[in-house]
Amino acid sequence: MQPGRFYVLRGENGAGKSTLLRMIAGLNEPTEGSILIYGIPNKQALNRMGYMAHAPLLYDELSGMENLRFFAQLYGISSDEPLAKAMERVGLDPKLERRVGQYSQGMRQRLSLARAIFHEPKLLLLDEPFSNVDPDSALQIAKLLADMRSSGTTILLVTHQIGLLANLADEYLMLSHGQLVDRGAMPGAAS
């Protein structure tokens, strides 16, 4: 993968897309070989990556901002400013005090994305970021991803909703049974 490019990871259910993202993010170990991010082992590059799981990894008993504060500690971030900015970028009010357990699925999905981007990662790994979000939120997320790509962030995204990304992503990678079987330019991608 090249820096600053937007890749869509495709394949049928069970092809290994989510597993590959989890391996890159350091959550699963590869059965053989190693994963390098910017020339260093992936587990040493965790501070350069943002990861959004298909099922939001959040604490239901905390507010949205409290969730982000918890994860910000892992990155040595003590200021609320980048956390509030990330929440606003995904269309959530950082002052909302409601517990995440009371959020809709779409709000949880957007908060999970805010958790993945508040530290401005160089590599963003997203597993189905458009699931459970309404059409307006999906467009807002697509615009956010376009802005991040323009700022040099490399994006690797798993989705079955290709239409939304046809003019945004640069390239698709097709997996089958855990193997890369095809790759190519996305329809509408600029060369």
Predicted regions and their residues:
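Catalytic Walker B motif of ABC-type/P-loop ATPase nucleotide-binding domains
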Residues: L124-D127
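Conserved ABC ATPase "signature" region
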Residues: R69, D80-K95
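H-loop/switch region of ABC-family ATPase nucleotide-binding domains
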Residues: T159-H160
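The feature captures the beta-strand-to-loop junction immediately N-terminal to the Walker
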Residues: R10-E12
